[in-house]
């Protein structure tokens, strides 16, 4: 039994074995005996032979032929079973614990994106998880979670003057009270209204960084599922124990605390 990490095993299965699925003897070694033959075909036709992914999401190899290893097929089937998995994002999820957030801007944006993802649902569906795993396996790396916090700036007028805001309470036609945010600057007195305040905003969007860290955690959760699923189901391989690293960015937080 060959011992392998779940990541290495999946990479082997998808890049070395499952590419044989759908290759067919008519387009495999019989018709294109080498990579040079493939280059020759390109020179003659002016284009590469078009290929669609096989049932495992892998482009069939022009060179490889024959049947894939039985363990690789088990790996491919396990990844396909991820389509039945449904993931969730808990309330209060904090993918940036290493960032200072004195004005709550990061938390507010994370919650906005979380709510958007929960409503749409496509990024939490098993189909997305299976596709994410296939992509990461083929690239031999997980999603890039590295991110730097953008600057916080005061909301300002076009001339750069910081704007003032204040809250006022009013009543509707039914006598119910509600609060609205209005201009906090008294232009007649040329000074802010009592209780007026400045507001801050992030200088650039962090939506992409939020989704990247969400996908990192999905990738790790999926690896846990696959490692457990394949643990006792292989003929010639043994999956090493796997401990998901859901927050690799936490080490950066610790480094900042010690600095």
What positions do the PLM features span?
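N-terminal interaction/assembly modules
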Residues: 1-124, 141-259
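A short pre-motif secondary-structure segment
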Residues: 132-133
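Short, well-ordered alpha-helical segments
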Residues: 129
């Amino acid at each position: 039994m060959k011992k392998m990490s779940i990541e290495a095993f999946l990479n082997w299965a998808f890049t070395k074995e499952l590419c044989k699925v759908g290759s067919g003897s008519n387009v495999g070694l019989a018709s294109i005996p080498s990579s040079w033959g493939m280059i020759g075909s390109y020179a003659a036709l002016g284009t590469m032979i078009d290929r669609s992914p096989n049932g495992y999401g892998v482009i069939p190899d022009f060179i490889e032929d024959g049947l894939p290893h039985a363990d690789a097929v088990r790996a491919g089937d396990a990844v396909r079973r991820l389509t039945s998995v449904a993931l969730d994002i808990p309330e209060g999820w904090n993918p940036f614990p290493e960032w200072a957030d004195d004005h709550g801007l990061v938390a507010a944006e994370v919650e906005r994106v979380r709510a958007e993802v929960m409503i749409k649902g496509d990024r939490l569906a098993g189909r997305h998880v299976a596709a994410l795993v296939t992509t990461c396996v083929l690239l031999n790396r997980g999603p890039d979670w590295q991110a730097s916090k953008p600057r916080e700036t005061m909301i300002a007028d076009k001339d750069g003057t910081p704007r003032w805001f204040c809250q006022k309470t009013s009543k509707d036609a039914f006598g119910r009270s509600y609060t609205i945010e209005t201009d906090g600057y008294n232009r007649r007195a040329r000074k802010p209204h009592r209780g007026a305040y400045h507001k801050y905003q992030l200088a650039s969007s962090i939506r992409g960084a939020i989704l990247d860290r969400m996908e990192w955690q999905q990738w790790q959760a999926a690896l846990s599922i696959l490692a457990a699923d394949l643990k006792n189901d292989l003929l010639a391989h043994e999956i090493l124990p796997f401990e998901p690293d859901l927050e690799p960015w936490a080490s950066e937080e610790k480094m900042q605390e010690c600095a």
